[in-house]
Amino acid sequence: MFSSRHILSNVRPIIKNLDLTRGFSDRKTKYFDLNDLIKTVNVTYKTGVNLEETTTVESKYVDVTPSSNTKGTVVTLSGSPGTHNDFKYMKSFFEQKKIRLICTNYPGSEFVTGGLHNSYTNQDRNSYMKSLMETLELKNVNRLIIMGHSRGGENALQLTSMLSNDENWPLVGAVMINSPGFAPHKGISKRMGTINFIISLIKRHNKTINSILHPILHYFYNNLIGLRVSHGKVAAAAILPMQTFAFDEQKLSIDDLRAKPGIRAFYGYGSKDFLIDEHQSEEVAMYFSEEDHYVISNKQDAEKAIKEARKSFTTGKQFVTANFKEEGHFLQKTYPEFIVEVVDSIFDADKEVDTKI
């Protein structure tokens, strides 16, 4: 084991070379967010290898509820790092469709107090989200879709698979946006050794190490990767789930959904995603289904594709996938209306089934 002194002697030169002040601007710009809509709730959930421990956190979330005639409810799961604000561009479109939007945050984000060191495996994350959804009494809504972006995508898939085994959950679908593939992607594959080393430092919970490590991680995420984080502590928490991806195990969840015709799913990705290679995303899309796959290069393509996707869902197809050729890692920002239309079409398809019954 390395001593703290040995670690610090190797980390300090990195700080010196990085010039942590470079790239930050003193000029503040207006930032559109959903923070004025935040609500707070305490969430108690199971954690640990065998879920034998209990953790309680204070969790902030956003709940945008139509005044009447709610068509359905969609719960969003952010990436790592990520927050409820990752889905802010969808708000107005969901409101127009009378769809209730609940944007959640995971332990480790700036909007959850507690659970930092024991809530980063998929088992922990799914346990937390299930408990949060129970606390918000989402078993009582009419229709429910779980939507995840990036790291949250595989959690959306797993949760939908898991909770749909219980008929008390009104689940009708899952939406995955820029979600990881079945193997380590370029965002982590070339850095896995470094990631594992950094995680070993984070897990020491050493104040001296953290005082040096957190500024480095804050700079790394904001200036080199381009993922916005508020603090080095948040950046450190965001790295922990990088070690616990499901990857190939996602196939088990997809296979499970395939056996549940009442559950529909959409998987969308961008060819120019700077974290995930196109061929890896395409592999996931084709595993869902080689049919009902759309290649979208512009807004006109998107308009045609959403009409066809809606038709596919309403005629009984389970899975729809789309490759946005000119887009990157944030489809919920560049094509928010398209994704909202997908959610709306899944709700409509389920409504038609109910009407026929």
From Swiss-Prot:
The keyword Hydrolase applies. Keywords: Hydrolase. SUPFAM superfamilies: alpha/beta-Hydrolases. Gene3D superfamilies: alpha/beta hydrolase. InterPro entries: AB_hydrolase_fold, DUF1057. Signal peptide: none annotated. GO terms for molecular function: hydrolase activity. The keyword Plastid does not apply. Pfam families: DUF1057. This is Uncharacterized protein F35H12.5. It comes from Caenorhabditis elegans. The lineage of its organism: Eukaryota, Metazoa, Ecdysozoa, Nematoda, Chromadorea.
